[in-house]
């Protein structure tokens, strides 16, 4: 095809899913002239699978995105139809906020934000090729022949890269939700030497809300107490007219139908070669893998206020359409349900993420960044977190400024990216609280304290919001100091309160911060029992209470972080030749040469590098033997 020279930009972002939107907004807000290209303007920030944001670990990522100046938290706070805090009976390290989204409002609100952002141009186009000159990415070429030049390019292709949809025996080339797939871009990446592989994900059927018998299901309402993802959202704006979700279960009859039709499932017939997600398996996989279970939970989730569609959560399937309907009709409450869209599996290309650095720049091509599902992750939140980091670094690169990264001790986003570039992934990667060694430091409640300063330094947090943040920090310290001054006396009221908690009496006066360390004692209880009011609002009090109750555990993790940072400070030279280092095990040598860790701490986290290998590498790097080998 004949090409023509179109406009020139500082940063080009390819793909306008959750990763692409964050990348483009970050770049534009940092002052870079940015172009956001999408296969379809109707798919901007679209939710092709579950209509929700947040959950364990993921909800904290959304708070981190917001603390850094990203958009996902603000957008969901404007468009949710239900909000719930999960794991409230557990410790603060695993509490998680989850919102049910109006997926259509979410898309429209994000598109409106992008269209009204200075420095940002949104355009519909299919990117077929990259412009690469002397090992540097300098733009893209579309299927209409337009050549857009840029200083940096961010790829966020999602599941569109050579996407193929499967519904029983039917399969066809397609992106998510029957959009155009991106075929030639994958071929371009392969020509440039990138290693691609095939992953698979899936989505469940959507059913008509009016054909459900809700009397046979269990209602899951939202929280009455105000909850927000964005630190800028106000309690007075909290939605009180929330929409319920509903829960039901599969049963032995459902499982019987699935087992009878496994030969028609592309997951089991061999038609699908891509690796599926471990933590979000299809209903067929669950029935086969957990044959001892006679039922599996199903959640019925509204997709919005202006649609009749209900998402049948935890019922992902690629069975033939008529089998899907037969399966649904066995479920309590769904006996007469009408299916509006069948579920499907989608297979797509991903780039092995060990080919990236912690900035999400590729090692092979400079100024080329990748983010989202094309890096092997699953989930909107993981994609958005990567998109934000890629967009920040693309903007910094365009200005010739130092890169920005987050460590495992600083954010779940840091854990996510480090896992990807250090360990790679053999299946769609899902972020879990268990993946974070320092999860007591990486909580939902303190994301602003961890990251707002960084967002302000980057130019993504304005001065007014930064002033509010500093005021909150001052109030936290003021209330911590105040609790160290207030005395709780052993009054009748105090000891009756303790007896109600099943605790021993107070025999003498103690400082309020010491009293607060007792189990189930809250800041509000201390205020009531002492008659002393603290200065902060409920969010400040929450922070103060956690800081006091978990002080010992937090201190322990801070000591571990200090050790990590000492190891992170020990840089490995980029041009080190691992073949010249004697004593390394063969597996360690191969893994180190493939991943090329930047620090000794990263090398330590590589599977296959044992303590003996690390000790040898440490000696070579720290004692100057590296230099001798080079000579």
UniProtKB/Swiss-Prot annotation:
The keyword Transferase does not apply. NAD(+) binds at residues 276-290. One of its GO terms (cellular component) is cytosol. One of its GO terms (molecular function) is flavin adenine dinucleotide binding. Keywords: Cytoplasm, FAD, Flavoprotein, NAD, tRNA processing. Pfam families: GIDA, GIDA_C_1st, SAM_GIDA_C. It is found in: Cytoplasm. SUPFAM superfamilies: FAD/NAD(P)-binding domain. InterPro entries: FAD/NAD-bd_sf, GIDA_C_N, MnmG, MnmG-rel, MnmG-rel_CS, MnmG_C, MnmG_C_subdom, MnmG_C_subdom_sf. Its main location: cytoplasm. Residues 214-233 are annotated as: Disordered. Its cofactor is FAD. FAD binds at residues 15-20. GO terms for biological process: tRNA methylation; tRNA wobble uridine modification. Homodimer. Heterotetramer of two MnmE and two MnmG subunits. NAD-binding protein involved in the addition of a carboxymethylaminomethyl (cmnm) group at the wobble position (U34) of certain tRNAs, forming tRNA-cmnm(5)s(2)U34. Belongs to the MnmG family. PANTHER family: GLUCOSE INHIBITED DIVISION PROTEIN A (PTHR11806), PROTEIN MTO1 HOMOLOG, MITOCHONDRIAL (PTHR11806:SF0). This is tRNA uridine 5-carboxymethylaminomethyl modification enzyme MnmG. It comes from Lactobacillus delbrueckii subsp. bulgaricus (strain ATCC 11842 / DSM 20081 / BCRC 10696 / JCM 1002 / NBRC 13953 / NCIMB 11778 / NCTC 12712 / WDCM 00102 / Lb 14). The gene is mnmG.
């Amino acid at each position: 095809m004949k090409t023509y020279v179109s406009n020139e930009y500082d940063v080009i972002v390819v793909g306008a899913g959750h990763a692409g939107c964050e990348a483009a907004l970050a770049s534009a807000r940092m002052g870079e002239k940015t172009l956001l290209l999408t296969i379809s303007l109707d798919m901007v920030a679209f939710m092709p699978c579950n209509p929700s944001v947040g959950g364990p670990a993921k909800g904290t990522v959304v708070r981190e995105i917001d603390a850094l100046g990203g958009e996902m938290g603000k957008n969901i706070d404007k468009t949710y139809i239900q909000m719930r805090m999960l794991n409230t009976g557990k410790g603060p390290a695993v509490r998680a906020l989850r919102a049910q989204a109006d997926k259509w409002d979410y898309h429209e609100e994000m598109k409106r934000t992008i269209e009204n952002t200075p420095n940002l141009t949104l355009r519909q186009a299919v990117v077929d090729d990259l412009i690469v000159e002397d090992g540097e990415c300098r733009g893209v070429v579309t299927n209409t022949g337009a050549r857009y030049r840029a200083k940096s390019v961010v790829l966020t292709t999602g599941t569109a890269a050579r996407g193929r949809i499967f519904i029983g025996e039917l399969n066809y080339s397609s992106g998510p939700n029957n959009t155009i797939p991106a075929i030639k871009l994958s071929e371009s990446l392969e020509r440039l030497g990138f290693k691609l592989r095939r992953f698979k994900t899936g989505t469940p059927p959507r059913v008509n809300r009016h054909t459900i018998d809700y009397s046979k299901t269990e209602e899951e309402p939202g929280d009455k107490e105000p909850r927000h993802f964005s630190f800028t959202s106000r309690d007075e704006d909290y939605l009180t007219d929330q929409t319920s979700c509903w829960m039901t279960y599969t049963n032995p009859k459902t499982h019987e139908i699935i087992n009878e039709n496994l030969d028609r499932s592309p997951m089991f017939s061999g038609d699908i070669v891509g690796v599926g997600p471990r933590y979000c398996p299809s209903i067929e996989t669950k029935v086969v893998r957990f044959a001892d279970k006679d039922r599996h939970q199903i959640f019925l989730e509204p997709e919005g206020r202006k649609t009749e569609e209900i998402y049948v959560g935890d019922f992902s399937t690629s069975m033939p359409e008529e089998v899907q309907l037969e399966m649904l009709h066995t479920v309590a409450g769904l006996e007469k349900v009408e299916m509006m869209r069948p579920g499907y599996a989608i297979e797509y290309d991903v780039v092995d993420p060990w080919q990236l650095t912690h900035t999400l720049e590729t090692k092979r091509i400079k100024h080329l960044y990748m983010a989202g599902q094309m890096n092997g992750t699953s989930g909107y939140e993981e994609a958005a977190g990567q998109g934000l980091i890629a967009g920040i670094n693309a903007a910094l690169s365009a200005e010739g400024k130092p890169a920005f990264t987050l460590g495992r001790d600083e954010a779940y986003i840091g854990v996510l990216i480090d896992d990807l570039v250090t360990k790679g992934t053999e299946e769609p990667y899902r972020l879990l609280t268990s993946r974070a060694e320092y999860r007591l430091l990486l909580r939902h409640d303190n994301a602003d304290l961890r990251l707002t300063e960084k967002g302000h330094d980057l130019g993504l947090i304005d001065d007014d919001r930064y002033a509010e943040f500093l005021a909150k920090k001052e109030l936290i310290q003021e209330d911590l100091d105040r609790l160290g001054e207030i005395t709780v006396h052993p009054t009748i009221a105090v000891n009756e309160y303790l007896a109600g908690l099943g605790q021993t009496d107070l025999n003498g006066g103690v400082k309020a911060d010491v009293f607060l360390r007792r189990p189930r004692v809250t800041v509000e209880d201390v205020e009531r029992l002492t008659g002393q009011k603290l200065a902060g609002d409920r969010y400040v009090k929450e922070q103060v209470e956690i800081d006091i109750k978990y002080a010992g555990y937090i201190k322990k993790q801070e000591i571990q972080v200090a050790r990590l940072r000492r190891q992170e400070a020990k840089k490995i030279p980029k041009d080190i030749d691992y073949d010249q280092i004697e004593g390394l095990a063969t597996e360690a040598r191969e893994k180190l040469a493939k991943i090329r860790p930047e620090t000794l701490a990263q090398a330590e986290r590589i599977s296959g590098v044992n303590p003996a290998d690390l000790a040898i590498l440490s000696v070579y790097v720290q004692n100057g033997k590296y230099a001798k080998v080079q000579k």
